Amino acid sequence: MVSTETLLHPGGYRTPWHSHRAGQLWRIATGLLVIESQRGRSVVPAKHIGWIPPGNQHAAFSESAIEGCAIYLDPACCTRLPDVPALFEPDDLTHALFSRLSVAESEYDPRKLTLLLDELAVAPQVHFTLPVPTDPRLKDVVRHLLQFVDDNQTVESHARQAGMSVRTFNRRFRAQTGMNFVNWRQLARVMQAMEWLAAGKPVGWIALSCGYSSVSAFIEVFRAWTGKTPGQWAVKEVPFGRR
């Protein structure tokens, strides 16, 4: 059994914790969605396919407007998909199959569903994808911040260097990444912190190297994005985002 739903949500969209009897596949066309589950938070960027298994408790929110579609699968159809929330990076064929199924108004082609599930079973899974803006001036800012994650320049300073007003900088940055500048920089730091934690760097050194004035401030931001403290993250057997 398959049903579909169009996803159209304004900025500031948020759901309470809930679950579905059906498995849920969804693709975000525009915007950026954050999924909270028992396993932590995952950033779901546009052009990816997300997955929530039947009965899995989760909540969702987004700062930006969301456009996309969802496909709900009977639990009997979900055996080849992960039993935990996942994010897939689909190829063109998978995108096309998803689109065909999502616009089926009454009946769907079971062959297309089987092929979609086959493709997702081997599709690469990603987590914590950091969107990159398309504007070359914003790209320069992003490259700098990825290289120097301890940079604490204000948004006014970055806007001035990019040759934009603060208002234009913020508007374009949000439009092209689905995030505001402050949250984007936080996520960039969290992702870098994950790499350093995996390399065995101490939390205090990481906090300073990420531009935080105190370890407690770093821990608070890290926990907000991952649901774990840096110490808890470091002892996990499987790094988040490689499941």
Give the positions of each predicted feature:
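Terminal helix-turn-helix DNA-binding modules in bacterial transcription factors
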Residues: 152, 156, 175-219, 235-243
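Helix-turn-helix
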Residues: 159-163
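Basic, amphipathic alpha-helical hairpins
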Residues: 101-105, 119-126, 140-157, 173, ...
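Short, Lys/Arg-enriched anionic-surface-contact patches
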Residues: 128-137, 171, 177-186
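N-terminal regulatory/effector-sensing and dimerization cores
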Residues: 1-87
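Amphipathic alpha-helical segments enriched in hydrophobic/aromatic residues interleaved with Lys/Arg
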Residues: 78-146
